[in-house]
């Protein structure tokens, strides 16, 4: 059964949970894929970035069929509770054994990495099974998708010869993705002057938020802990003189931040700061009722012997946190449920005199993406800072005459007696990179049911994973 492959065998998710593989640290998991190819006598290609392509010849009777590319990424987002001591660079991901009985694979207090470990499990299972009917296959394992699609961008696609590509980096069974937004990372940075402060020092903590994926979850209206921190600092500043000692919120720009801390020097006393935090907690819970019900703002005393940003630099930092937009910027005029453009400040950091805001910009329109990037750059220049852009990737345009999508719909209907949904999504997929490099490539993206990806509540439905695997085998048989 695929359940065995997913959870208990050589090719399972558990295997890859034993190999640390957060973004930018994928050498070991690339080696795992390379060794798999060697052990199975399969031709492979590995580039300097760490991308791996494994080739498998067609099964009997499929030698003259068009080649199919199977594709997924091997890096994962590392998210954990703030109190966790888990080190994603060396510690394994521990699967919650009790959750298996309820039908889900999840990890203990960390992200699971089913995004996109499930694609790796599928591809290795297919490559390992010589009983499957399939055309020539090219299994593409890319690195650093979660930090700007860097692996796909670096891959020399001249090593690929497929006509069709099946990307397995989607998170809802029965929903076939046929297009996606483009994206860009933008880091606003500002150097500050720090000196000793004699005022009381407090830690302002924003927690209890759901967080989520800055693409697929941004349309829910979930708040960002980084944005809320800016609101809290502004409220305190209205009643007292404050200076910022440090800020920390979020680890990656493509996740909605669910926890943030601000350490401030302040002329107000603890009781006043604590009262303001309680007031804002009540206000925010009312504002986000039904969206994020457990928001909590709390204050704690901290070491008074600290250096803090100057008053002017503190004002400039708060200005950056308050004035740039957050969340959905625009929606599709014909489909209000479809987000077209968004902005997410996933990373907030102030330490050693340097302030940084890391943004994920997404849009279906290159011009709108550029407009937001320019606004961030303008703000950086206004406060005397600088801006660095990276990870610019194109949108994936919907192909109206896709044979692959038509075939996938037919197979799904035959197997489950209902039609799938076809959608264009706001999240960025590597499909856009491949579509740009290989314009004739016919692409579809799908995957099993996953929930709360990019958070430590991430979980994968085992039953759904089984069905999607069976569907993939049947689709390969038909191509």
Where are the language model's segments positioned?
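Fold-level recognition of mixed alpha/beta catalytic cores in primary-metabolism enzymes, strongest
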Residues: 134-225, 233, 237
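Single conserved hydrophobic/aromatic residue that forms the stacking wall/gate
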Residues: 1-8, 13
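Active-site metal-coordination/substrate-binding segment of hydrolases
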Residues: 62-163, 189, 198-199, 311-315, ...
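Acidic-enriched catalytic cores of C-N bond-cleaving enzymes acting on peptides and small amides
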Residues: 195-199, 218-248, 268-342
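Zn-dependent metallopeptidase/amidohydrolase metal-coordination segment
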Residues: 9, 333, 340-353, 360, ...
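A short beta-alpha structural unit
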Residues: 18, 250-252, 262-263, 296-308, ...
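His/Asp/Glu-rich mid-to-C-terminal helical/loop segments that flank catalytic regions of hydrolases
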Residues: 222-239, 268-270, 315-322, 330, ...
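A non-catalytic alpha/beta surface segment that caps or lines the substrate-entry region
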Residues: 22-66, 423
């Amino acid at each position: 059964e695929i359940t065995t492959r997913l959870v208990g065998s050589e090719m399972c998710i558990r295997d890859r949970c034993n190999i640390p593989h957060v973004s930018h640290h994928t050498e070991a998991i690339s080696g795992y894929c390379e060794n798999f190819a060697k052990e199975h006598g399969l031709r492979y290609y590995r580039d300097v970035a760490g991308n791996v392509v494994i080739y498998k010849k067609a099964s009997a009777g499929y030698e003259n069929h068009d080649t199919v590319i199977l594709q997924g990424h091997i890096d994962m987002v590392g998210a954990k509770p703030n109190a966790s001591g888990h080190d994603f660079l060396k510690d394994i991901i521990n699967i919650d054994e009790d959750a298996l009985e309820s039908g889900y694979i999840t990890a203990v207090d960390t992200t699971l990495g089913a995004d996109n470990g499930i694609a790796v499990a599928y591809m290795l299972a297919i490559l390992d099974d010589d009983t499957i009917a399939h055309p020539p296959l090219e299994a593409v394992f890319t690195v650093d998708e979660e930090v700007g699609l860097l692996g796909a961008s670096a891959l020399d696609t001249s090593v690929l010869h497929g006509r069709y590509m099946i990307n397995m980096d989607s998170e809802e069974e029965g929903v076939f993705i046929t297009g996606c937004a483009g994206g860009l990372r933008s880091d606003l940075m500002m150097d500050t002057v720090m000196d000793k402060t004699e005022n009381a020092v407090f830690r302002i903590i924003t927690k209890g938020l759901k967080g989520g994926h800055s693409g697929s979850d941004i349309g829910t209206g979930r708040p960002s802990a980084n944005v809320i921190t800016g609101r809290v600092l502004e409220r305190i500043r209205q009643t007292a003189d404050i200076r910022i000692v440090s800020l920390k919120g979020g680890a990656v720009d493509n996740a909605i931040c669910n926890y943030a801390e601000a350490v401030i020097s302040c002329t107000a006393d603890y009781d006043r700061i604590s009262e303001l935090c309680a007031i804002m907690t009540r206000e925010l819970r009312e504002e986000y009722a039904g969206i994020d019900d457990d928001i909590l703002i709390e204050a704690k005393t901290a070491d008074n012997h600290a250096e803090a940003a100057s008053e002017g630099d503190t004002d400039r930092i708060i200005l950056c946190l308050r004035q740039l937009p957050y969340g959905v910027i625009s929606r599709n005029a014909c489909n209000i449920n479809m987000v077209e453009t968004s902005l997410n400040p996933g990373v907030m950091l102030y330490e050693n005199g340097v302030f940084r805001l890391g943004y994920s910009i997404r849009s279906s329109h290159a011009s709108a993406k550029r407009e937001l990037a320019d606004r961030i750059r303008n703000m950086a220049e206004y406060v005397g800072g600088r801006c660095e852009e990276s990870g610019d990737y194109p949108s994936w345009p919907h192909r109206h005459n896709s044979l692959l999508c038509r075939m996938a719909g037919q197979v799904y209907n035959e197997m489950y007696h209902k039609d799938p949904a076809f959608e264009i999504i706001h999240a960025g997929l590597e499909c856009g990179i491949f579509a740009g490099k290989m314009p004739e490539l016919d692409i579809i993206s799908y995957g099993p049911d996953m929930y709360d990806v990019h958070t430590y509540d991430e979980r994968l439905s085992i039953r759904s994973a089984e069905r999607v695997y069976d569907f993939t085998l049947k689709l390969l048989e038909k191509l």
